[in-house]
A protein has these predicted regions:
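Catalytic loop of short-chain dehydrogenase/reductase
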Residues: 59-100, 111-119
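Canonical Rossmann dinucleotide-binding motif of NAD(H)/NADP(H)-dependent dehydrogenases/reductases
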Residues: 1-28
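NAD(P)-cofactor binding segment of oxidoreductase domains
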Residues: 36-63
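Structural signature of the Rossmann-like NAD(P)-dependent dehydrogenase/reductase core
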Residues: 5-6, 40-42, 62-68, 105-108
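Conserved Rossmann-fold SDR core element
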Residues: 99-112, 143-147
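Short-chain dehydrogenase/reductase
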Residues: 50-55, 91-97, 134
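C-terminal helical subdomain
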Residues: 119-151
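Flexible cofactor-recognition loop at the NAD(P)H-binding site
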Residues: 10, 44-46, 69
Length: 151
């Protein structure tokens, strides 16, 4: 399988990119969306994950978007809720595309052990646990619309 992964400089994207199993044999990481079989839509940058989801889905490839359990926490007017709104938009776009037959999945993780959540004092999943969930979706013979995984 050929994988295209966004957000590879740090956190979950960097962890996935450096996995030996994705850099040997028939598995490899490619440098652009057109050359992949599986797109892991990992980099959060405003609403850009939504745009990338629509762009790749139109090419008929499997897309796994890394959402967030924060997409359930979208009420209020504080800046902190903007992240949840952006992830809710990703979740809703995934929902729409799934129901028209696209092979898209949104995985909504709770906190996981990364630079971004280093100061958060809540239980966190390991990056390996996150990868194990992603791998389960990849290996599943059925389409998986969405899954939320938290500690």
């Amino acid at each position: 399988m050929r994988y295209y992964i966004t957000g590879t400089r740090r956190g979950l994207g960097a962890f996935i990119t450096n996995l030996p199993e994705l850099n040997t044999g028939a598995n490899r990481i490619v440098d652009n969306l057109d050359d992949c079989d599986i797109f892991i839509n990992c980099k959060h940058d405003g609403f850009s994950q939504v745009d990338l989801l629509y762009e790749d889905e139109s090419k008929g490839k499997k897309v796994i978007s890394i959402g967030s359990a924060a997409s359930d926490w979208i009420h209020g007017h504080k800046d902190v809720y903007k992240y949840g709104i952006e992830k809710a938009a990703l979740r809703n776009a995934n929902d729409q595309l799934y129901y028209v037959g696209s092979d898209v999945t949104c995985i909504n993780f709770g906190y996981f052990d990364s630079e971004r959540s280093a100061d958060v004092d809540y239980p966190k999943m390991s990056l390996q646990q996150c990868w194990d969930t992603i791998k389960w979706v990849i290996d599943n013979p059925n389409r998986v619309k969405e899954i939320t995984v938290c500690v």
